Amino acid sequence: MTVAVIIVAAGRGTRAGEGLPKQWRDLAGRPVLAQTVAAFAGLGRILVVLHPDDMGLGMDLLGGSVVLVAGGSTRSESVKNALEALEGSDVTRVLIHDGARPLVPASVTAAVLAALETTPGAAPALAVTDALWRGEAGLVAGTQDREGLYRAQTPQGFRFPEILAAHRAHPGGAADDVEVARHAGLSVAIVPGHEDNLKITYAPDFARAEAILRERKGLTMDVRLGNGYDVHAFCEGDHVVLCGVKVPHVKALLGHSDADVGMHALTDAIYGALAEGDIGRHFPPSDPQWKGAASWIFLDHAAKLAKSRGFRIGNADVTLICERPKVGPHAVAMAAELARIMEIEPSRVSVKATTSERLGFTGREEGIASIATVTLIGA
């Protein structure tokens, strides 16, 4: 028996939020699609069906570990394209799986393959246990008997020659490959599905999926707290850069880079949470290449380092301490810029300001200080 796995990820759905197709969004430190591919590692050859515009992304993410196939205008066309790519091979069994189901247990896949020894098709499903209603105009119009009803899952498995012929003969518009198979007269066995095998569709599904992954690893949540502090003195100039935003002022800030005191404090907070020292360790002020450098370079490095270590940024809080300039009118733009660099939602970033009540060097308007706090959450 030679197995091929077809992972269908050609959709453009953004119901899960953030404007990015869900298969490319991060899940526990890796894109959803990478997690899905990993679930079938070692089983056989893997074909990943992508939207034509995403072929470059697929190559960057998966390289030569899989065969990339350009999808069609419908799911059925996408699957057929992958099946056609297998014609002439030695494949005898094919598993067709949703790219947005990254948590399929190996036991489910094994059950599907075992069933194919006695039937031309097999698919996992869970019996419907909730009460079912029929609705009309927002009102309950009746109830539906749930006896014999199932929630379909994937991978849906078939003997290769039969499902290829079925797709070639199907007129199109099928909800899934079981419908295509049944249209061709093929019997499809139901094998037990699994609650972990959820299809990521909406934003809350990501939190549920990450919880399942943590439970599988036997890990409690790894939460780290980092603090950062920075100070820069005023010098001659007509503006300051705070949290990536140019703010008009009667003075500038003195520093080896662009002296963005808020971004420096936040960057140090991330490094601190990772036990990675401070900016000076990674970007020494003695190195002339960083003279006048934009501070987003430092923050971007820290955020990517956190991600590479398996952490996501839970939230960031930056406090700027100065008498002038006024930060309030620019705070929203500052938070948005920090969020953009760290690739997190703006709602997870806070920028605010306070004074030292005319005390100390900030009270004497000799410079600006900043304190930042960040939480890192392990995947």
From Swiss-Prot:
InterPro entries, sorted: IspD (IPR001228), IspD/F (IPR026596), IspD/TarI (IPR034683), ISPD_synthase_CS (IPR018294), MECDP_synthase (IPR003526), MECDP_synthase_CS (IPR020555), MECDP_synthase_sf (IPR036571), Nucleotide-diphossugar_trans (IPR029044)
Pathway: Isoprenoid biosynthesis; isopentenyl diphosphate biosynthesis via DXP pathway; isopentenyl diphosphate from 1-deoxy-D-xylulose 5-phosphate: step 2/6; Isoprenoid biosynthesis; isopentenyl diphosphate biosynthesis via DXP pathway; isopentenyl diphosphate from 1-deoxy-D-xylulose 5-phosphate: step 4/6
Annotated a divalent metal cation binding sites: 230, 232, 264
Disulfide bond entries: none
UniProt cross-references to Gene3D superfamilies, sorted A to Z: 2-C-methyl-D-erythritol 2,4-cyclodiphosphate synthase, Spore Coat Polysaccharide Biosynthesis Protein SpsA, Chain A
Keywords for the protein's UniProt record, in alphabetical order: Isoprene biosynthesis, Lyase, Metal-binding, Multifunctional enzyme, Nucleotidyltransferase, Transferase
Residues holding 4-CDP-2-C-methyl-D-erythritol 2-phosphate: 230-232, 256-257, 278-280, 354-357, 361, 364
Annotated site (Transition state stabilizer): 15, 22, 256, 355
GO biological process assignments: isopentenyl diphosphate biosynthetic process, methylerythritol 4-phosphate pathway; terpenoid biosynthetic process
EC number: 2.7.7.60, 4.6.1.12
Name of the molecule in the record: Bifunctional enzyme IspD/IspF
Record gene name: ispDF
